[in-house]
Amino acid sequence: MKYLIVLYAYVLNPLLNLIPIAWIDIFYDNMTHVGNAMHHPYYLIAWATSTAVGLFVSSLLIWRKYKISYSLGLHFLLCSGWILSCCIPYSVDLPGWINDAHVWIAIACTIGFSLEWLILYTKKESFIYSEIKTLLYVLQFVFLICFGTLASAGHVNALCEMLYSISVNGVLAAFVLRFVL
């Protein structure tokens, strides 16, 4: 199990995230551009699936180990929302509501996932274990950096998406490897 987590978090997911560097300007374009305008929809879905599965599984492993209450249905909905968002095409030729659905599902799921972790600050069971407290501080810092990347560009770009996918998955995987397994 440890081998699979290392392979996923530190090889497969980063490689999937770094591929667009050869295709687009990661400071301007986003992953949707790769999937729709550049006609690589299977890459886009693979990227979203990789990100979502890693975040879903790592979170569950941590929450179960430390007996932190969570909503499995909500967590599944938030993580699978990224995949759903990437399956909805984005194009100027499509009705605006389709493009809006693509964008707002992705935004809602990203914010929702981040809030799932940040809300743990309000739960007393989160502070029983010092390692969970440390994880929350590290995740808060990572979320802040990701938001800073978004704010500095003024829009969602591939760098922001790649940074969130690699860093949050990496932090959660490192925690799972060190404290859970």
Question: Where in the sequence are the language-model features?
Answer:
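Membrane-interface helix-boundary motifs at transmembrane edges
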Residues: 1, 60-73, 122-132, 181
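Membrane-proximal helix-loop-helix units in multi-pass membrane proteins
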Residues: 78-135
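Terminal transmembrane helical module of multi-pass membrane proteins
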Residues: 124-181
